Amino acid sequence: MAVQKNKPTRSKRGMRRSHDKINIHKFSVDKVSGEIHIRHCLTKSGFYCGKKVLNKKNK
């Protein structure tokens, strides 16, 4: 069983926790449709980097 030898300092604890923050998604505007979307993701209309890559099928 692992048992620590020394108590971690407040500084070391803070350094460990510094990467636990929640990141906010970056948004961008599509060149063609003008939609706001998350970076590196498709828009709702199927555009990616200004090109139509996904066609919606009507049911």
Curated annotation (Swiss-Prot):
Give the GO cellular component terms, alphabetically: large ribosomal subunit
Alphabetically list the UniProt keywords: Ribonucleoprotein, Ribosomal protein
Q: Kindly list the GO molecular function terms attached to this UniProt entry.
A: structural constituent of ribosome
Ranges for the region named Disordered are 1-20
The UniProt regions of compositional bias labelled Basic residues, in chain numbering, are 7-19
Q: Which GO terms describe its biological process?
A: translation
Family statement drawn from the similarity comment of this UniProt entry = Belongs to the bacterial ribosomal protein bL32 family.
Q: Which NCBIfam families match?
A: rpmF_bact
Put simply, this protein is called Large ribosomal subunit protein bL32
The organism encoding this protein is Wigglesworthia glossinidia brevipalpis
